[in-house]
Design a protein with these regions (language model features):
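A short, small-residue-rich loop immediately preceding and capping a beta-strand
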Residues: 35-41, 60
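N-terminal beta-loop-helix "entrance" segment that forms/cooperates
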Residues: 10-25
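Short Gly/Thr/Asp-enriched flexible loops that form oxyanion-binding sites at enzyme active sites
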Residues: 47-60, 64-65
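Gly/Ser/Thr-rich loops at beta-strand to alpha-helix junctions
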Residues: 42-47, 88-89
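C-terminal binding/interaction regions
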Residues: 70-176, 180-181
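Short, well-structured alpha-helical segments in soluble
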Residues: 24-34
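Single conserved hydrophobic/aromatic residue that forms the stacking wall/gate
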Residues: 1-8, 12
Length: 182
């Protein structure tokens, strides 16, 4: 069983964030250690997934149903998912979400699916991690400094962000940068 800790779903309630800002926020939370896993989304989930995967230290999957959730964690062992909040979320959406979260955190991440494919899947995951380490090697703080600072400030302007972020942050360099955004 994976211990879950809710860092704060209220971090971005005050203002509506774009999926790009959600990507910035997710990258800050994951790279700083303030969160172990991020759940986000947008209308289709695609934009949010692309935004999150634009940052180092983030591996986001697009999850539409429980089997997506289970296979993403077992095969790809990522640290974020993007859900489609508009597309296909009509009747039974609450059931779909319940089952997604049940399957998302079922079993040990990276355990493979089907189980007999665990060795090649883990090998491919290590290869992917190596490719991402090369293609996304820039330091997160340096990436954030090169972005439009108003965009970054907007991503961390949520009412509860500072309280929850600084209470859980484990990376001093990221914490110092976030302080400059006040």
């Amino acid at each position: 069983e994976i211990p879950l800790r809710l860092v704060g779903s209220e971090m971005c309630i005050r203002d509506r964030l774009t999926y790009v800002q959600n990507g910035i926020l997710a990258a800050i939370l994951l790279n700083s250690g303030a969160a172990d896993f991020v759940v986000t989304g947008c209308g289709t989930g695609e934009g949010a997934m692309l935004a999150l995967n634009s940052f180092p230290g983030v591996l986001c999957g697009h999850v539409v149903d429980p089997s997506d959730a289970y296979m993403f964690m077992q095969i790809n062992d990522g640290n974020a998912i993007a859900l489609p909040f508009a597309k296909g979320f009509g009747w039974g959406a609450e059931l779909n979400l319940t089952y997604i979260f049940e399957k998302l955190f079922e079993g040990e991440p990276g355990g493979g699916y089907p189980k007999e494919r665990v060795v090649p899947e883990q090998r491919n995951k290590k290869i992917l991690d190596g490719v991402r380490a090369v293609t996304l090697k820039q330091d997160l703080v340096e990436v954030l400094k090169e972005l439009d600072q108003d965009l970054v400030k907007g991503a961390v302007a949520g009412e509860k962000f500072e309280e929850l972020f600084f209470a859980n942050c484990k990376d001093e360099k990221i914490a110092e940068y976030v302080k400059t955004l006040r």
